[in-house]
């Protein structure tokens, strides 16, 4: 039997190109499983094969635990240390037992286990082989085509899957076609595919530029981000680490040669190369190209920008089906609101009027005084109440410290009165504490929800985004986040 084990291990190792150690591990597992079947109760068996002679020893073992739940497999620490004081929790007590003689059933079990272990070893080998290739472009031959995906043969018994959503629109492949894509995921636990390739994600565009533009590989040019509408249009942001190099020109190439190669690989996808800037507003202006931006207003609190363009330039700025502004939003990470110059002026005039009326009513000011505060950029009572006094006295018309002190006192009193009114409104509406404590919720929004008869988490979870869009303080995205947070708690039990 020992000679048969050695011959079998050598044959399988050579056939599968796997280390002999892996084959012996599979054989040990197979013999252990066959041995367990000889017992009428649950046991833990370990088998050790001598790789030189093929002889094997069999051990029955007990796990050292605090509390025994399976007496046939576990032993307490106190009992284990009776024979070996050095044993610790998590270690094993072993007794050598008689090794089984292989009969037909035992041999069949061994073959099944060996086959499973070999498949696992082969899959582990593929994962190890391609782990360092993750994030890079790989090339394979189409092996199988289905409605939802294709399977690529990458060589050396390695296969990768490209899902339909990771292909370009209208992209069709046949068995035998050569395909390039980015290996974006290596999944060691995958039961079917372990390697996943994409042609539609931004990483594909980035890696193609790394290949076609040597200055990127030499780190003279840096890619700062990319956004794609796969197969149609893309934007990629670049910056130069060498003042002598024009990053946009280098990426375009002589007569557009470099970017054209990338466009051809991506089925005609048009690529805008955007100059990155550490000034967010300038970066957004660059990202909106080819549209000309007339003016831009940054809202740091909401991480958004209002972009104004001339009326005859609006369609180009937005793009077909919103494509240009959508890609610019993805590339920059800012929420971008595109409108005409007239619309922007009207919007901000309305906002100024709202703030003006707030100051007039809450602070009991005349319109002229309130207008001074608005023109100086104050937009809330909190800003007036807690800004350093010297900043207010530096404003023309507000040099008097007593006047400024009175102004700040009125602002603080107005804030306190508003807070008390909010608390009374919430108490009267019987708003649930869980709703008030929801992430992203504030008392003002809670009052607006209460006016809509939404006073509990369950009631909020039942709403749609359209039901909350008339609340001025909420954007559609913020409304969606609140609703989803409520659903996660009420429907899925995620506290």
From Swiss-Prot:
Broad class of where this protein is predominantly found: cytoplasm
Residue ranges annotated for the S1 motif domain, each copy included: 135-200
Keywords recorded for this protein, A-Z: Cytoplasm, RNA-binding, Transcription, Transcription antitermination, Transcription regulation, Transcription termination
Annotated ranges, domain KH: 302-374
One Pfam family named in its UniProt record: NusA_N
Domain of life: Bacteria
Gene Ontology, cellular component aspect: cytosol
CDD domains attached to this UniProt entry: KH-II_NusA_rpt1, KH-II_NusA_rpt2, S1_NusA
Intracellular or extracellular location(s): Cytoplasm
GO biological process: DNA-templated transcription termination; transcription antitermination
One Gene Ontology molecular-function label: DNA-binding transcription factor activity
PROSITE patterns with a match to the protein in the record: KH_TYPE_1, S1
Keyword presence, Cell inner membrane: no
Cited NCBIfam families: NusA (TIGR01953), nusA_Cterm_rpt (TIGR01954)
Protein task: Participates in both transcription termination and antitermination.
Family: Belongs to the NusA family.
Complex formation: Monomer. Binds directly to the core enzyme of the DNA-dependent RNA polymerase and to nascent RNA.
Protein name: Transcription termination/antitermination protein NusA
The species this protein was found in: Haemophilus influenzae (strain ATCC 51907 / DSM 11121 / KW20 / Rd)
UniProt lineage: Bacteria, Pseudomonadati, Pseudomonadota, Gammaproteobacteria, Pasteurellales
Gene: nusA
């Amino acid at each position: 039997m020992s000679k048969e084990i050695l011959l079998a291990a050598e044959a399988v190792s050579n056939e599968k190109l796997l280390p002999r150690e892996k084959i012996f591990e599979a054989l040990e597992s197979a013999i252990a499983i066959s041995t367990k079947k000889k017992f009428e109760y649950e046991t833990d068996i370990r088998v050790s094969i001598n790789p030189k002679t093929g002889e094997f020893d069999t051990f029955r073992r007990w796990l050292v635990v605090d509390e025994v739940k399976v007496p046939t497999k576990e032993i307490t620490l106190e009992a284990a240390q009776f024979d070996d004081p050095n044993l610790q929790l998590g270690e094993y007590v072993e007794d050598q037992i008689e090794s089984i003689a292989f009969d037909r059933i035992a041999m069949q079990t061994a073959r099944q286990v060996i086959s499973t272990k070999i498949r696992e070893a082969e899959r582990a080998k593929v994962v190890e082989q391609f782990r360092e290739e993750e994030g890079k472009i790989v090339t394979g031959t189409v092996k199988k085509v289905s409605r939802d995906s294709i399977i690529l043969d990458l060589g050396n018994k390695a296969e990768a899957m490209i899902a339909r959503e990771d292909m370009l629109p209208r992209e069709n492949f046949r068995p035998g076609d050569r395909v390039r894509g980015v290996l974006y995921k290596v999944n060691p636990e995958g039961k079917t595919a372990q390697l996943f390739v994409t042609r539609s994600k931004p990483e594909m565009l980035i890696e193609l530029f790394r290949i076609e533009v040597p200055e990127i590989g030499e780190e003279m040019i840096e890619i700062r981000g990319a956004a794609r509408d796969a197969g149609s249009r893309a934007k990629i942001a670049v910056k130069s680490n060498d003042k002598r190099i024009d990053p946009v020109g280098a990426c375009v190439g002589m007569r557009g040669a470099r970017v054209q190669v990338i466009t051809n690989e991506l089925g005609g996808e048009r690529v805008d190369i955007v100059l990155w800037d550490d000034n967010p507003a300038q970066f957004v202006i660059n990202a909106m190209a080819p549209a000309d931006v007339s003016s831009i207003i940054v809202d740091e609190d909401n991480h958004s920008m209002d972009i104004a363009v001339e009326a005859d330039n609006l369609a180009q700025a937005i793009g077909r089906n919103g494509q240009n502004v959508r890609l610019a939003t993805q590339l920059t990470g800012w929420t971008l609101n595109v409108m005409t110059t007239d619309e922007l002026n009207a919007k901000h005039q309305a906002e100024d009027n709202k703030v003006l009326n707030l100051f007039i009513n809450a602070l009991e000011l005349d319109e002229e005084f309130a207008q001074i505060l608005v023109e100086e950029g104050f937009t809330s009572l909190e800003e007036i109440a807690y800004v350093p006094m010297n900043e207010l006295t530096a404003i023309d018309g507000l040099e008097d410290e007593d006047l400024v002190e009175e102004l700040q006192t009125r602002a603080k009193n107005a804030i306190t009165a508003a807070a008390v009114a909010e608390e009374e409104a919430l108490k009267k509406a019987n708003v649930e504490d869980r709703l008030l404590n929801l992430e992203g919720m504030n008392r003002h929004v809670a009052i607006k929800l209460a006016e809509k008869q939404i006073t509990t988490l369950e009631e909020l979870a039942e709403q749609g985004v359209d039901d909350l869009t008339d609340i001025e303080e909420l954007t559609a995205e913020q409304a969606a986040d609140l609703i989803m947070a409520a659903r996660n708690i009420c429907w899925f039990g995620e506290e």
